[in-house]
């Protein structure tokens, strides 16, 4: 996904980390997705819009960046479960798109099919600028950030090498998780804080 040097690299902003609350038996009591913003040449892209009740936190995070909901140009949902797309309605000016595997969403931003949790699951792969890059040359100026949705919902899934508990096809879920791990420098999971796979 190399880019010409005269082109702007996308920048990634976490508006809200995801979370998941389970009872002692492991049953899900509450699930709230990560909400991620990408600045691109094509405009502002929001990936997943969260659950009902997250509106205030999302709008405040946008305001902290000097943005309003009307500034969002494109919505991409990693899948169609309500904890990931319930707030699409907040961004009425934005166009919701449904990219296919490998489709270029914007320069430096591409869809990656990651089925298993749901048939329509995708992840968003971003060739992201690191601001500021380290001046000593020890870190790349870009990192591959994968906004994984529920294909890789938590750090625990990565550490234990287990797919999401909720899935329609376990083999596909494992393959999708492994695909993300092989590509990503940084993962923004569906229901946890971002974590780094490579320094």
What are these regions (language model features)?
Residues 53, 113, 119-199:
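Metallo-beta-lactamase
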Residues 21-27, 51-54, 74-75, 111-115, ...:
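Short, flexible loop segments at the rims of nucleotide/cofactor-binding pockets, characterized by
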Residues 6, 85-92, 103-107, 198:
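Short loop/helix-cap segments at secondary-structure boundaries that form the rim of catalytic
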Residues 45-47, 147:
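Conserved catalytic cores of phosphodiester-cleaving nucleases, focusing on short active-site segments
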Residues 55-97:
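Active-site metal-binding motif and surrounding structural segment of the metallo-beta-lactamase
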Residues 1-42, 108, 179-183:
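Zn-dependent metallo-beta-lactamase
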Residues 71-72, 94-100, 147-149, 166:
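Short hydrophobic/aromatic-enriched beta-strand-loop microsegments
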Residues 14-17, 35-39, 45, 101-133:
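Core dinuclear metal-dependent hydrolase active-site scaffold
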């Amino acid at each position: 996904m190399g880019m010409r040097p005269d082109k702007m690299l996308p920048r990634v902003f976490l508006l809200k980390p995801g979370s998941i609350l389970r009872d002692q038996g492991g049953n899900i009591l509450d699930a709230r997705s990560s909400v991620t913003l990408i600045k691109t040449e094509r405009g502002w892209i929001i990936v997943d819009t969260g659950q009902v009740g997250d509106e205030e936190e999302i709008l405040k995070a946008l305001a902290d960046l000097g943005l309003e909901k009307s500034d969002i140009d494109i919505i991409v949902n990693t899948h169609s479960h309500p904890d990931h797309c319930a707030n699409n309605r907040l961004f009425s000016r934005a166009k919701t798109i449904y990219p296919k595997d490998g489709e270029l969403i914007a320069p430096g931003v591409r869809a990656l099919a990651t089925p298993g949790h749901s048939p329509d699951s995708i992840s968003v792969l971003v060739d992201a600028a690191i601001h500021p890059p380290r001046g000593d040359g020890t870190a790349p100026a870009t990192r591959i950030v994968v906004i994984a949705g529920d294909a890789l919902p938590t750090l625990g899934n990565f550490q234990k090498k287990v797919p999401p508990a909720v899935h329609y096809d376990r083999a596909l879920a494992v393959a999708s998780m492994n695909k993300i791990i092989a590509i990503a420098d940084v993962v923004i999971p569906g229901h946890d804080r971002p974590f780094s796979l490579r320094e």
